[in-house]
From Swiss-Prot:
A biological-process GO annotation: threonine biosynthetic process
Disulfide bonds: none
Protein source organism: Citrobacter koseri (strain ATCC BAA-895 / CDC 4225-83 / SGSC4696)
Catalysed reactions listed for this entry: L-homoserine + ATP = O-phospho-L-homoserine + ADP + H(+)
GO MF annotations, alphabetized: ATP binding; homoserine kinase activity
GO cellular component terms, A-Z: cytoplasm
Subcellular location(s) of the protein: Cytoplasm
Keywords: Amino-acid biosynthesis, ATP-binding, Cytoplasm, Kinase, Nucleotide-binding, Threonine biosynthesis, Transferase
NCBIfam families in the record: PRK01212.1-4, thrB
Protein's UniProt name: Homoserine kinase
EC number: 2.7.1.39
Primary role: Catalyzes the ATP-dependent phosphorylation of L-homoserine to L-homoserine phosphate.
Family: Belongs to the GHMP kinase family. Homoserine kinase subfamily.
Pathway in which the depicted protein is active: Amino-acid biosynthesis; L-threonine biosynthesis; L-threonine from L-aspartate: step 4/5
Record gene name: thrB
Length: 309
């Protein structure tokens, strides 16, 4: 049997719409992500477990893990009889790369089980394709960091899909999921078809400056440049209490904050553990809307998807 864990990820990071993403892991050592197991069987079966299993489609063929198995078999040109188990620990429509977790864990598990017939680049391409079935367009800003770990910049040139950007060890990512769902497709539909020239210029300046600050090891400058003129001005209206929360965490001492992925999760970046804890406490009391919500203090997950057993 092969068991694979795929971590949560925070896409866009305010400054890099559709081209930046970071894999994250709680500092307390708990797992924030999905687990997929693959075992030999006479015919294909899929079993769903975990805290959010009841949110998955009831029809097996609509389950993204089934679609991963089907696409993997197509790639190899043969049917592979296996028993798959999805441990769905990530809330759907959370802005934490929930579908990417399932896609990455399923495809890595299948590849490991079959003796690694596909290389990382081919696997990542298929991951983006399957993620696109859910979000409505192929993009890699969740699957790439989830699979490869760390902070990833999407390249998509010369056969390179993404490359790692150096992060900062002192950065702590406070992630607050309020317990409501926002579909990626809905969050994309709310965006304008065209942008003003000055917004495009600002976006390019922020992103280029952020990447430069990461490579030149200027954490304060990097955090200052984490600004979103592309998505947040439009998506904020989908998130109750978001604007107030951003103001509050800034007053507490967060270096930057924004929407994780397409929301509703809010991320706040801190460089001191006590600040991160105070931010987490405030968000836990004021941003969460029901019992399904949670707050985690995280750091970059540099390992990405990994075999557990």
């Amino acid at each position: 049997m092969v068991k694979v864990y795929a971590p949560a990820s925070s896409a866009n990071m305010s400054v890099g719409f559709d081209v930046l993403g970071a894999a994250v892991t709680p500092v307390d050592g708990s797992l924030l992500g999905d687990v997929v197991s693959v075992d030999a069987a006479e015919s294909f079966t899929l079993n769903n477990l975990g805290r959010f299993a009841d949110k998955l489609p009831s029809a097996p063929r609509e389950n993204i893990v089934y679609q991963c198995w089907e696409r993997f078999c197509q790639e190899l040109g043969k049917q592979i009889p296996v028993a798959m188990t999805l441990e769905k620990n990530m809330p759907i429509g959370s802005g934490l790369g929930s579908s990417a977790c399932s896609v990455v864990a399923a495809l890595v598990a299948m590849n490991e089980f079959c003796g690694k017939p596909l290389n990382d680049t081919r696997l990542l391409a298929i991951m983006g394709e399957l993620e696109g079935r859910i979000s409505g367009s192929i993009h890699y800003d969740n699957v790439a960091p989830c699979f490869l770990g760390g902070m990833q910049l999407m390249i998509e040139e010369n056969g390179i899909i993404s490359q790692q950007v150096p992060g900062f060890d002192e950065w702590l990512w406070v992630l607050a999921y309020p317990g409501i769902n926002v579909s990626t497709a809905e969050a994309r539909a709310i965006l304008p078809a065209q942008y003003r020239r000055q917004d495009c210029i600002a976006h390019g300046r922020h992103l280029a400056g952020f990447i430069h600050a990461c490579y030149s090891r200027q954490p304060q400058l990097a955090a200052k440049l984490m600004k979103d003129v592309i998505a947040e001005p439009y998506r904020a209206r989908l998130l109750p209490g978001f604007s107030q929360a951003r103001q509050a965490v800034a007053e507490i001492g967060a270096l930057a904050s924004g929407i994780s992925g397409s929301g509703p999760t809010l991320f706040a970046l801190c460089d001191k553990p006590d600040t991160a804890q105070r931010v987490a406490d405030w968000l836990g009391k004021n941003y969460l809307q029901n019992q399904e919500g949670f707050v985690h203090i995280c750091q970059l997950d540099t390992a990405g998807a990994r075999v557990l057993g």
